[in-house]
């Protein structure tokens, strides 16, 4: 597909029909994308088409791509989401040959129990058994109740904010996981973990059984900036090597965040995939 063809495709927001799954497992390691990577594209259809062009066969759906554009409507939407439309999203990925592996729905302290439960009902409508969540630590007991009820794994996502009620440190996950069901787990962002001055390789080796997905990005230590893969301090190659040699069944989802205005999202995510493939070769 040429760049001109892709531009036409994204403008029309049409997904290419696919009859076979996209193969993006390299040396036994699943490489996919958090669809937040494609936040600058005009629609979810354009995101799916981009993943097809790049050759990414695993997706973690960012809820920002399906939430109402009018922020004043978001709370009501979370209470009563359009389930028929959400089921249709699964079909978009299936038709494109992409495994919709997880749904990103971030539970917060201010959510009602009904809004928390709707996240699990949306996951079921999407046909996924895993949710990733940028959440408050204190909401985890309420979430765990529904995770166990619906038998859906929740992986809590980390940043490097170091705020006491956010996930940044190993102790934050310990607080959330201790005493919870097997369905409460970890979505380890190796870039943010490095920026917070922790080692993602040793953490992966110690806690792999609780890790739902990995987010692959590169950052500098000491809360430094996002960088193109290979230019920061994150030991991406070490993480991928552990997945390869230990055969952990954990997908590594590229999360492209270093982009600046004017950069070509599709071209940059292709570079990210190329880096991962080279690291695994």
What are these regions (language model features)?
Residues 59-63, 100-103, 132-133, 251-254:
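Short beta-strand segments at enzyme active-site cores
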């Amino acid at each position: 597909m040429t760049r001109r063809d892709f531009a036409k495709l994204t403008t029309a927001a049409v997904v290419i029909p696919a009859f076979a799954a996209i193969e993006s497992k390299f040396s036994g390691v699943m490489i996919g994308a958090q669809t937040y990577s494609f936040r600058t594209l005009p629609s979810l259809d354009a995101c799916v088409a981009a993943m097809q062009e790049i050759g990414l066969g695993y997706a973690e759906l960012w809820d920002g791509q399906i939430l109402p554009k009018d922020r004043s409507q978001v709370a009501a939407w979370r209470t009563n989401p359009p389930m028929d439309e959400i089921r249709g999203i699964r079909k978009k990925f299936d038709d494109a040959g992409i495994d919709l592996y997880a749904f990103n729905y971030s539970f917060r302290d201010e959510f009602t129990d009904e809004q928390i439960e709707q996240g699990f009902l949306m996951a079921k409508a999407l046909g996924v058994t895993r949710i990733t969540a940028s959440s408050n630590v204190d909401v985890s007991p309420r979430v765990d109740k529904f995770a166990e009820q619906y038998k859906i794994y929740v992986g809590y996502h980390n940043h490097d904010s170091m705020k006491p009620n956010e996930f940044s440190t190993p102790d934050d996950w310990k607080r959330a996981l201790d005493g919870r069901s097997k369905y409460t787990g970890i979505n380890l962002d190796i870039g943010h973990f490095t920026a917070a001055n922790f080692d993602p390789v040793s953490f992966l080796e110690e806690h792999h059984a609780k890790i739902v997905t990995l987010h692959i990005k590169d950052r500098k230590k000491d809360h430094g900036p996002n960088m193109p893969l290979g230019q920061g301090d994150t030991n991406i190659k070490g993480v991928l090597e552990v997945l390869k040699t230990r055969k952990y069944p954990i997908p590594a989802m590229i999360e492209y965040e270093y982009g600046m205005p004017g950069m070509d999202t599709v071209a940059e995510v292709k570079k990210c995939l190329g880096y991962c493939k080279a690291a695994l070769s």
